[in-house]
Amino acid sequence: MKRILVVFLMLAIVLAGCSNKGEKYQKDIDKVYKEQNQMNKIASKVQNTIKTDIKQEDSNTHVYKNGKVIVIGIQLYKEREKMYYFPYEIKDGKAEINREIDPIKYMKDHKADYEDENVEVEKK
């Protein structure tokens, strides 16, 4: 009986250690997508080909610096397949776009803590 209890305890520890890393960052990732959708809604008033409902499951998400930097790759325009990347920083619990970061260079130069690749992109 003790062996069974020990096995279950060890299994619980292993499963807890293997939990999905993305859950750790999900609140901040949600903030980033919400901010991006708000910006897209404003931009779509000027250019109606911009998508206004960006979803994480249709995009690529890369988390860096333990959740402080999040780069998302989205299909910005309705009729284009091209992915556009936007870098965000999480400051004081808010997602803010950082226009000083080159997202492609940043992704090449840094190792991601978490990646969620939902759209296949040709790596150059």
Short names for language-model regions:
Residues R3, K24-K27, N37, D92:
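Intrinsic disorder/low-complexity segments enriched in polar/small residues
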Residues K27-V46:
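Post-signal peptide N-terminal segment of mature Sec-exported envelope proteins
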